[in-house]
Structures are given as structure tokens and as C-alpha cells.
UniProtKB/Swiss-Prot annotation:
It is found in: Cytoplasm. SUPFAM superfamilies: Thioesterase/thiol ester dehydrase-isomerase. It comes from Shewanella frigidimarina (strain NCIMB 400). Belongs to the thioester dehydratase family. FabA subfamily. Pathway: Lipid metabolism; fatty acid biosynthesis. This is 3-hydroxydecanoyl-[acyl-carrier-protein] dehydratase. Gene3D superfamilies: Hotdog Thioesterase. GO terms for biological process: unsaturated fatty acid biosynthetic process. Homodimer. The gene is fabA. The lineage of its organism: Bacteria, Pseudomonadati, Pseudomonadota, Gammaproteobacteria, Alteromonadales. It catalyses: a (3R)-hydroxyacyl-[ACP] = a (2E)-enoyl-[ACP] + H2O; (3R)-hydroxydecanoyl-[ACP] = (2E)-decenoyl-[ACP] + H2O; (2E)-decenoyl-[ACP] = (3Z)-decenoyl-[ACP]. One of its GO terms (cellular component) is cytoplasm.
Length: 171
């Protein structure tokens, strides 16, 4: 059976409940912490390193929850939410490839913020290039990523690391 190469919001929410990739595969967060509305493309051999890529989007509207509290009279999307979306996508990629377990962010090499997401923006686009995939006792993905708002790059991150664990009780 061929794997899907794009996903809707409904499918991503189903992933958060264990109903898309399978019950033992990494899950996405749901509700407010799911920072992705759709995956436009996902593949195992594309991207800058030929090891996979993901392009995903988040629709921006003035009524998103974080604009009411970050900050009063100066609404801006928290940078950490964009970074978390990148980690979410690396974990999703590993589950899409077949990894089983629970995903955990393990770190990032460097993050740069050169812009902001304001309530009048329309769309955030995440672009991830998978650099390395480890599928042994340790399952880990490493990626470089950018985040654009309305076509302008405003975040970049190198060496985003996500691990997949069968037991997180001692993590």
C-alpha cells in the first residue's frame, strides 16, 4: 500500500488520537498545540539532502488563542510555537516512515528569528529538509527547517532532533 504524501487537518487530528498512522506510532498534539493545518507534501527522498522533506501550513486568523495573551495590546505568535511545529513535523515524519513509540524533541542546533507572525498575517509555511534518519535501537530524525509568513522567511532552525521512544517513563 502506497503511503499518502499529503494530509488534511482532520487527518492530523486523527494522528493525535492514534487513528491515522496506527496506535503505536508517534502522535501529534491536538487542539491548541497542533500548530499545523495541513501537510502539503511529505516524501522520503526529496529535500536539500535527498533524505526527505515536509512542507506544511498553518492558517493565521486574528482569533487564534495566543494573540489574546501574547501580548496584551501587542499580539504576536510566540516563537516557541513555530519551533514546536517544526519538532512536531519531524516526529510525524518518523511515524509516517513506520517508527513506533512516543516522540520527544531532543534539541536544536541553532534557531534564528528574523520576523514575527501578527494577527493580520494569512499563512505560515513550514519547510523541513531531513538530514539524517536513524532506525536502529534508537530512532531519531534530524532536520533543518524554515518558517515563512505570507511567503517571507522569518525563522530558521538547524539540526532539529526528535527521538522515538518505546518507554518514556525514565525520560
Amino acid at each position: 500500500m502506497e503511503k499518502a504524501n499529503s494530509f488534511t487537518k482532520e487527518q492530523l487530528v486523527a494522528c493525535g488520537h492514534g487513528n491515522l498512522l496506527g496506535p503505536n506510532r508517534p502522535r501529534l498534539p491536538v487542539d491548541n498545540m497542533l500548530m499545523i493545518d495541513r501537510i502539503i507534501t511529505i516524501n522520503e527522498d526529496g529535500g536539500a539532502f535527498g533524505k526527505g522533506e515536509i512542507i506544511a501550513e498553518l492558517d493565521i486568523t486574528p482569533d487564534l488563542w495566543f494573540f489574546d495573551c501574547h501580548f496584551i495590546s501587542d499580539p504576536v505568535m510566540p516563537g516557541c510555537l513555530g519551533l514546536d511545529a517544526m519538532w512536531q513535523l519531524v516526529g510525524f515524519f518518523l511515524g509516517w516512515e513506520g517508527a513506533e513509540g512516543k516522540g520527544r524533541a531532543l534539541g536544536v542546533g541553532e534557531v534564528k528569528f528574523t520576523g514575527q507572525v501578527l494577527p493580520d498575517a494569512k499563512k505560515v509555511t513550514y519547510k523541513l529538509n531531513i538530514k539524517r534518519k536513524i532506525h536502529r535501537k534508537l530512532v531519531m530524525g534530524i532536520a533543518d527547517a524554515t518558517m515563512e509568513v505570507d511567503g517571507r522567511q522569518i525563522y530558521s532552525a538547524t539540526d532539529l532532533k526528535v527521538g522515538i521512544f518505546s518507554d518514556t517513563s525514565t525520560f
